[in-house]
């Protein structure tokens, strides 16, 4: 099995013929991703999950044989799967609110528009499903 997170998600897509490009805005903050295709390993089940993002590039076209598993307003391919052996997730389930706060302040203060940082920081206390998403990843790997 192969699991890609953030850049790894993008690398899987590009290596298999998908298209990855830099987009106009950064994807940062705890953003909801809608589950567009329920997979057997996605338990506990959710229709959408809140999860932290930190990216400027993203998958725009799926690789050959790929399918969209989740989508977000700012990121149409928030998660993808290829067959039953590859999973890519643009978001960061390893980020908790404290880590995201420190990272965003350290990386974006003074280098990016203040409104971008303020918006991301305003999402720190939004509903978060990082443990459930990490559980899905483990279930995916174990099922391969």
Give short role names for the model-derived ranges.
Residues 1-39, 50:
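Cysteine-nucleophile active-site neighborhood
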Residues 21, 36-144:
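Amide-donor transfer/coupling interface in amidating biosynthetic enzymes
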């Amino acid at each position: 099995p192969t699991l890609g997170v953030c850049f790894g998600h993008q690398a899987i897509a590009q290596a298999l013929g998908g298209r990855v490009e830099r987009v106009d805005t950064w994807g940062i903050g705890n953003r909801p991703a809608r589950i567009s295709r329920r997979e057997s390993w996605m338990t506990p089940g959710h229709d959408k999950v809140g999860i932290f993002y930190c990216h400027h590039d993203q998958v725009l076209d799926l690789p050959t044989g790929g399918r969209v598993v989740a989508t977000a307003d700012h990121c149409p391919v928030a998660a993808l799967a290829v067959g039953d052996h590859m999973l890519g997730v643009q978001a960061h389930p390893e980020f908790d609110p404290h880590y995201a706060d420190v990272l965003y302040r350290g990386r974006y203060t003074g280098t990016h528009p203040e409104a971008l940082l303020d918006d991301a920081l305003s999402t720190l206390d939004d509903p978060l499903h990082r443990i459930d998403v990490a559980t899905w990843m483990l279930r995916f790997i174990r099922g391969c």
